[in-house]
């Protein structure tokens, strides 16, 4: 499909136009019409009802929901994607509440500073949805996309969305969405592109502590960061003052290898090798909580069970329903930005780490391989990393 740049979509929204926002194939795999409440024109909701044909909802921030006492529609949300519906509403000035103009009045009242909870009748014909506070970086839904787009256009954190359906009542997908885009002259973006746009703008790590850390491999400074998005704790082990071009090891936490010295992998040996290198040459190790290439400790152990039954490290992840590698290097890039590191000599054998850092604006100027000895227990694992995952070992 043909997609537009986020900046072009933002300009269209500020002109009062609707845009199409498409989510992931593994999620709802649908396109929604999205407009920003503050900028939408008088025909927006009528267009959504006539051409979109889906349910018209009003994504809002948590603060707006609290302001108007908009409580969840149900006590126990069993929606497959956790869509956070509140009780439906009509503005007190509307008639039946269902006309396009009544729903427009209700939506606009949600961003009126003078509106009060008493101005809304419940239930009604407009369905507010509460967005997660960290937007698409926390949940990749149309709700969060609409509120994020509103904020990016400097508008009140509220929008209007509607699923796009075909004339026969089926959901529009793929080529059908592209035809809809061209028929109505609309911009179309993906939530994935919005996630990447937000990550580029995001500064989501905060330094919480810094201490001296003597180790078996030298004396380091240890920095403790926290992600404001996930509340995860990230440790950085550093030697010397940060440089514009820095020696960097991005190490994914491996409890079994780093702590218990498991011979199933080479993680612990790589960490020790990196510490020795950084102690001698300066630089930093960013220790990310990405156990099992992002699937978590228990799932990693389940993958080990499958490996004992004949799978390799890639097919085991796939059999559990995961991609072969779920890791993202957004947080690592944020930490490097914190230290004003613009390019790195990356201590790694993994090309995906080069790509992951480059995606977030960190240049990989050079690479230092980390070569560790194989053993009888990790030989097949190492071979799979080389052949199937492209590791340079």
Curated annotation (Swiss-Prot):
Residue positions of the active site: 325 (proton acceptor), 327 (nucleophile)
GO terms for biological process, alphabetical: riboflavin biosynthetic process
Annotated binding of Mg(2+) 2, by residue: 28, 142
Cofactor names: Mg(2+); Mn(2+); Zn(2+)
The organism's place on the tree of life at top rank: Bacteria
Location of the region described as DHBP synthase in the Swiss-Prot/TrEMBL record: 1-200
Co-factor: note: Binds 2 divalent metal cations per subunit. Magnesium or manganese.
GO molecular function: 3,4-dihydroxy-2-butanone-4-phosphate synthase activity; GTP binding; GTP cyclohydrolase II activity; magnesium ion binding; manganese ion binding; zinc ion binding
Residues at which Zn(2+) binds: 254, 265, 267
Recorded metabolic or biological pathway in which this protein acts: Cofactor biosynthesis; riboflavin biosynthesis; 2-hydroxy-3-oxobutyl phosphate from D-ribulose 5-phosphate: step 1/1; Cofactor biosynthesis; riboflavin biosynthesis; 5-amino-6-(D-ribitylamino)uracil from GTP: step 1/4
Binding residues for GTP: 249-253, 270, 291-293, 313, 348, 353
Enzyme Commission number(s) of this protein: 4.1.99.12, 3.5.4.25
The entry's keywords: GTP-binding, Hydrolase, Lyase, Magnesium, Manganese, Metal-binding, Multifunctional enzyme, Nucleotide-binding, Riboflavin biosynthesis, Zinc
Record site feature (Essential for DHBP synthase activity), residues: 125, 163
Ligand binding (Mg(2+) 1): 28
Family designation: In the N-terminal section; belongs to the DHBP synthase family.
Name of the protein in its database record: Riboflavin biosynthesis protein RibBA
Species this chain originates from: Staphylococcus haemolyticus (strain JCSC1435)
Name of encoding gene: ribBA
């Amino acid at each position: 499909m043909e997609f537009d740049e986020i900046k072009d979509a933002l300009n269209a929204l500020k002109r009062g136009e609707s845009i199409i926002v498409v989510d992931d194939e593994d999620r709802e795999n649908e396109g929604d019409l999205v407009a920003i409440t503050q900028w939408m024109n008088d025909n927006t909701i009528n267009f959504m009802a006539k051409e979109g044909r889906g349910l018209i909802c009003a994504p809002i921030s948590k603060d707006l929901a609290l302001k108007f006492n908009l409580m969840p529609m149900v006590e126990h949300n069993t929606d497959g994607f956790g869509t956070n519906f509140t009780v439906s509403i009509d503005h007190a000035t509307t008639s039946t509440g269902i006309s396009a103009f009544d729903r427009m009045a209700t939506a606009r009242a949600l961003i009126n500073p003078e509106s009060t909870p008493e101005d809304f009748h419940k239930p009604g014909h407009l369905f507010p949805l509460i967005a997660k506070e960290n937007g698409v970086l926390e949940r990749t839904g149309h709700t969060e996309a609409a509120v994020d787009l509103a904020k990016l256009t400097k508008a009140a954190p509220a929008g209007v969305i509607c699923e796009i359906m075909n004339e026969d009542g089926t959901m529009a997908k793929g080529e059908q969405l592209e035809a809809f885009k061209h028929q109505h002259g609309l911009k179309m973006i993906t939530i994935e592109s919005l996630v990447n746009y937000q990550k580029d703008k995001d500064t989501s790590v905060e330094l919480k502590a810094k201490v001296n850390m003597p180790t078996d491999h030298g004396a380091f400074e240890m920095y403790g960061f926290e992600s404001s998005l996930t509340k995860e704790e990230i440790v950085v082990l550093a030697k010397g003052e940060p440089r514009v071009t820095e020696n960097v090891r991005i190490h994914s936490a491996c409890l079994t290898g780093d702590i218990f010295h498991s011979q199933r992998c080479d993680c612990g040996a790589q960490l020790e090798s990196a510490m020795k290198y950084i102690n001698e040459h300066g630089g930093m190790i960013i220790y990310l909580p990405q156990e099992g290439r992002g699937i978590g400790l228990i799932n990693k152990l389940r993958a080990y069970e499958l490996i004992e039954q004949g799978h390799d490290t890639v097919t085991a992840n796939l059999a559990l329903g995961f991609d072969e590698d779920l890791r993202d290097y957004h947080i690592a890039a944020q930490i490097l930005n914190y230290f004003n590191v613009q390019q790195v000599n990356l201590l790694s054998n993994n090309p995906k780490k080069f790509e992951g850092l480059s995606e977030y604006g960190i240049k990989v100027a050079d690479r230092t391989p980390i070569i560790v000895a194989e053993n009888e227990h990790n030989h097949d694992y190492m071979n799979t990393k080389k052949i199937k995952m492209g590791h340079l070992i």
